[in-house]
């Protein structure tokens, strides 16, 4: 219950403001993994698809939370249906992305790469 409350508070906090990536699609390209993230207009939902790498073909729609870190830099996190957890630190100005994700089998991955609008 506390996690649900916390997620609701984050959602409410951002209800009146939307991040600049809202309504846009981006490609993240890391060494060994490429994915697209399509952010919905609501500032809460995102569709992802891993297009290259060992997890290619994985796709879904998730609810995400976001927090500004610095000018143009955002922490974005979500949990996928298979219980994988993902955290991005995306610098939309510089076009860079850092991803930290844990697979359903609890393998931790740390990736660094590029970010570009499609």
Q: For each of these PLM feature ranges, what is it?
A:
Residues 5, 10-35:
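Tryptophan-anchored aromatic micro-motifs
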Residues 20-22, 38-47, 69-72, 89-97:
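Short, solvent-exposed coil/turn segments at beta-strand boundaries
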Residues 28-30, 48-52, 78, 101:
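Beta-turn initiation residues at beta-strand->coil junctions
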Residues 30-32, 41, 80:
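A generic beta-sheet turn/junction motif
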Residues 35-67, 103:
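N-terminal glycine/threonine-rich, aromatic-flanked beta-hairpin/loop signature
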Residues 54-89:
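Contiguous, well-ordered beta-strand patches that form the walls/edges
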Residues 75-118:
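Beta-sheet ligand-binding and adhesion/scaffold domains
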